[in-house]
């Protein structure tokens, strides 16, 4: 005998009817599982209420400070990394740094002066530190803004 579409029914216990409270003395009637008297019996208690103990939002410290929404953030590249990635030197742009995986695309790049530079590099970046500029110029190179 083949199963027809109208013969299908859910497994026993798959669809359990929800308890309808407050619908007569025999089944969770009268107080409907809320107990007698008090806030919980009369109205709903806020979800964040912790039973009279110190609320969680008051346990957390009051952090001060200021977050500047207009701060410009740079991806940094140090001179030792520039020399490691470009041992022959030459002209280096942000696109070159992106292609070797030193920085991400479409973001500002700043060169910092950690490490030594022995090759001549002509960097085209968004920003640089004073120490980086001194070391680059000492090695015979230059830094220009893109």
From Swiss-Prot:
UniProt feature, compositional bias: Low complexity: 29-43
InterPro entries: Ribosomal_uL15, Ribosomal_uL15/eL18, Ribosomal_uL15/eL18_sf, Ribosomal_uL15_bac-type
Keyword rRNA-binding: yes
Ranges where the record places region Disordered: 1-46
Residues in the signal sequence: none
One GO MF term attached to the UniProt entry: structural constituent of ribosome
Alphabetical list of Gene3D superfamilies matching this protein: 3.100.10.10
Keyword rRNA-binding among record annotations: yes
Entries under Pfam families matching the protein: Ribosomal_L27A
Any GO BP: translation
One Gene Ontology term, aspect cellular component: cytosolic large ribosomal subunit
UniProt keyword terms in alphabetical order: Ribonucleoprotein, Ribosomal protein, RNA-binding, rRNA-binding
Family according to the record: Belongs to the universal ribosomal protein uL15 family.
NCBIfam families in the cross-refs: rplO_bact (TIGR01071)
Entry function: Binds to the 23S rRNA.
Subunit structure: Part of the 50S ribosomal subunit.
Name recorded for this polypeptide: Large ribosomal subunit protein uL15
Annotated organism of origin: Cutibacterium acnes (strain DSM 16379 / KPA171202) (Propionibacterium acnes)
Gene from which the chain derives: rplO
């Amino acid at each position: 005998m083949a199963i027809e579409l109208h013969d299908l029914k859910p497994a026993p216990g798959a669809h359990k009817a929800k308890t309808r409270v407050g619908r007569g003395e025999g089944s969770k009637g009268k107080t409907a599982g809320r107990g007698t008297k008090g806030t919980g019996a009369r109205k709903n208690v806020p979800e964040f209420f912790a039973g009279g103990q110190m609320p969680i939002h008051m346990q957390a410290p009051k952090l001060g400070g200021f977050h500047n929404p207009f701060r410009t953030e740079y991806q940094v590249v140090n001179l030792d990394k520039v020399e490691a990635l470009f041992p022959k030197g030459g002209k280096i742009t942000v696109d070159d740094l992106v292609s070797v995986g030193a920085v991400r695309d479409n973001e500002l790049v700043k060169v910092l002066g950690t490490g030594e530079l022995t090759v001549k590099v002509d960097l085209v970046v968004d920003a640089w530190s004073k120490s980086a500029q001194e070391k680059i110029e000492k090695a015979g190179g230059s830094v220009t803004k893109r």
